[in-house]
Amino acid sequence: GAERQPLASLYCALPDLVYSRADLAPYAMMDSRPGVKYLVGLHLPASPADNYALLTYFLGRAVDALRTNNVAGAARYAGTLVHMLEDWGCPAHVVPDDNMFTLFKQFLPPPEKYAHVPLHSLVESGTFTVAIDGYRPSLAGTSVPEAAFILLRRSQEGTRFARGQVVPILNALYAGDTNAWNAAQQTAACFGARLAADALYTLICLARDRFGPDEAGALQRIDLTYYAPLEAPDLYLPQAAFFSRPYWGYATVGASLRDGKTAVPLALRVSEAGRETIRVFEHGVGVGTRSVLTYLIPKDVYARFQVSAGLHAELGGSGHVRFEILGNGKRLADLSPVQGTMPAHTLDLPLAGITNLQLIATSAGGDGSGNHAVWGAPRLLKDTRKGSER
């Protein structure tokens, strides 16, 4: 309708216009922060909790407006929503605490021409076309809290992807290679455009309460493996995560590390139909002991949490590990220590009211050298016996 063009050409820049367009500024502000016009989080990715709060608020506002046929208001809130999603995946915005690349220059020194120039604008000022022809947007959820949660993960993927373009962009800029400079920016921009399309499509589906059965069915269970834990607020593990056993013990997605160097597929001894077998997990996290992984989850969207917890079938022969799972700080599971070749525990835990889920692995004795702990196939499941909350 009439708001399509303003959404594409004006509202998507709305958070940048809060001081010059008083009429638009309220659509980039939050009730919880009255009087604050410029929300930094709409431009720079923050912690998972902060980003989730922003996604929930602005997606919710847009959905509420569209449900009441306030198309103009919905389009303005949608502009803020897609702006932050695209900025979180823009190479110029994704280096933590270094928006002007002053620290980055120390790692990748520029030629004299750029020695004293803040590089932020140059990293995002290419000339290219963003085309996602043929892309079919995907549904991110059947409720606002669920959709914000799924968009959070996809935005984290966008941030990581954009970080991979920073060095190619700077190398091309330093070398005066305009084509390569534009191409690296374009790659990240197309990723962001697809994410924005997912958000807009989901917004409309939520407002009109229309969900294809296949789309909704695909959201019945969610793999928690690829969500960033709260211990990695900037999507990488800080130094504090590297002080555990064995090796450095830090969380490794999809693998355990032999001697701290060689990735080994996640494998656990499990009991199936009364027999013990070794199961390889494509999805999961390998950790050492003194490990805590904390995940934000949307309240009452998912009914249960399932995971297999144990020692790696090949590397954990001398291990002694205690596994605990906490929800909102209260113990959901406290397993008797797993030792050596003991089979893993398979857990199925209720999640009612829980917004904070912690997976904890600690040493239960020994020297820790065999404490190759595995969280296999951690996933969130909806209650299939009732309709989705909308």
Ranges and model annotations:
Residues 1-76, 91-205, 209-216:
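N-terminal, motif-rich segments that launch catalysis or mediate targeting to/interaction with membranes
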Residues 13-15, 20, 81, 203, ...:
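Hydrophobic alpha-helical elements and their junctions with loops/disorder across both membrane
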Residues 74-86:
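Short alpha-helix carrying the canonical HExxH Zn2+-binding catalytic motif
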Residues 85-90, 315:
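Short alpha-helix boundary/capping elements
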Residues 211-390:
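Gly-Asp-aromatic-enriched flexible segments
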